[in-house]
């Protein structure tokens, strides 16, 4: 979407579900496996490093353990080592809004909370840790927070996006505007397509300035990793809202209809049925619907060919989990495009 000619050379994941999707969608990319075990000196350098260290320890929906050794979010250290060694032209880091407030550990300080060695010093937050590490290895950075509904999605998922580039550069300004998105054919293979139009993408990008996209619409709850469970869970930062798998069992979308229609228009794709029947014949949240809510191409994570050997229940659960951990592609593209063009404004 941002740089359609870019080639994905490496990925790094160890979970079976995401690994299956990555292998199918990026068949020529090498999965380097456990990021903590990679010797980056043996890996051929690349132009762009993009990642989002696991968010569960930063998310308001998680246990808020923070970014420190022994936590999943602490995997940022491995990403930072990759950046330090490979020296890419552009770094993109994405995470939950909790990165703005979750505590962090830094090798620059003796403690895990206050800076400056005293109890009254400022608290180091996860985003501050990332910025400090990047500065320490010679990278400047710009960042923003963007909600999925700011680009027209029917839910409010907020994400922090950061771009960084070698210090002293004026910025890694992209020469391309939004390209065509990628969608899948009948066999679920990715190829060039038109899931999101250039006009729609650029139109919703302008909402960054107004901050009004979605302001007048009632939004669906954000997909979460808990949606596969019977009772689901609340969306991040929306503890008083019902879980998505409860809302979709309502006979009519009612107040949510305008938000759904808007996303259908932007993606050029009709919303799938929001529920499917369980083995017991009861309606339950459809993983095809959450895939659509996240703005993913049809079949990107739900194509049955990906899940050979999985039961229907297991397939649904792994897809809901991936959607709950994911980010809307148009949301990410809008944020990256905005940040990489700040110096040109």
For the regions a language model picked out, list residue spans one by one.
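Alpha-helix C-cap/termination motif
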Residues: 2, 25, 41, 85-86, ...
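SAM cofactor-binding core of SAM-dependent methyltransferases
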Residues: 1-38
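C-terminal target-recognition/interaction regions appended to catalytic cores
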Residues: 187-191, 195-345
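Non-transmembrane alpha-helical segments in soluble domains
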Residues: 19, 23, 80, 131, ...
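Class I S-adenosyl-L-methionine
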Residues: 38-48, 56-228, 252-271
């Amino acid at each position: 979407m941002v740089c359609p000619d870019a080639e994905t050379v490496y990925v790094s994941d160890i979970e079976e579900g995401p690994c299956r999707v990555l292998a199918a969608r990026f068949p020529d990319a090498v999965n380097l496996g456990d990021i903590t075990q990679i010797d980056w000196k043996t890996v051929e350098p690349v132009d762009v490093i993009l990642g989002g260290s696991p968010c569960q320890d930063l998310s308001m929906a998680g246990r808020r353990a923070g970014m420190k050794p022994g936590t999943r979010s602490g995997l940022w250290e491995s990403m930072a080592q990759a950046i330090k060694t490979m020296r890419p032209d552009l770094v993109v880091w994405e995470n939950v809004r909790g990165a703005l407030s979750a505590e962090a550990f830094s090798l620059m300080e003796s403690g895990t909370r206050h800076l400056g060695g005293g109890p009254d010093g400022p608290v180091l937050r996860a985003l501050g840790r990332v910025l400090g590490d990047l500065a320490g290895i010679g990278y400047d950075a710009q960042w923003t927070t963007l909600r999925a509904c700011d680009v027209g999605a029917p839910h409010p998922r907020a994400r922090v996006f950061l771009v960084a580039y070698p210090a002293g550069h004026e910025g890694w300004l992209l020469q391309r505007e939004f390209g065509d998105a990628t969608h899948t054919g009948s066999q679920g293979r990715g190829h060039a397509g038109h899931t999101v139009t250039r006009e729609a993408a650029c139109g919703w990008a302008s909402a960054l300035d107004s901050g009004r996209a979605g302001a007048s619409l009632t939004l669906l709850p954000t997909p979460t990793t808990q949606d596969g469970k019977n009772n689901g869970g609340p969306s991040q930062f929306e503890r008083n809202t019902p879980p998505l798998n409860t809302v979709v069992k309502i006979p009519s979308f009612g107040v949510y209809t305008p938000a759904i229609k808007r996303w259908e228009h932007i993606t050029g794709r009709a919303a799938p049925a929001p529920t499917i029947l369980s083995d017991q014949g009861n309606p339950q949240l459809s993983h095809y619907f959450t895939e659509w809510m996240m703005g993913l191409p049809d079949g990107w994570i739900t194509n049955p060919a990906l899940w050979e050997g999985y039961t229907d229940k297991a397939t649904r659960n792994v897809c809901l989990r991936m959607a709950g951990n994911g980010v809307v592609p148009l949301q990410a593209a809008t944020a990256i495009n905005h940040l990489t063009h700040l110096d040109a404004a």
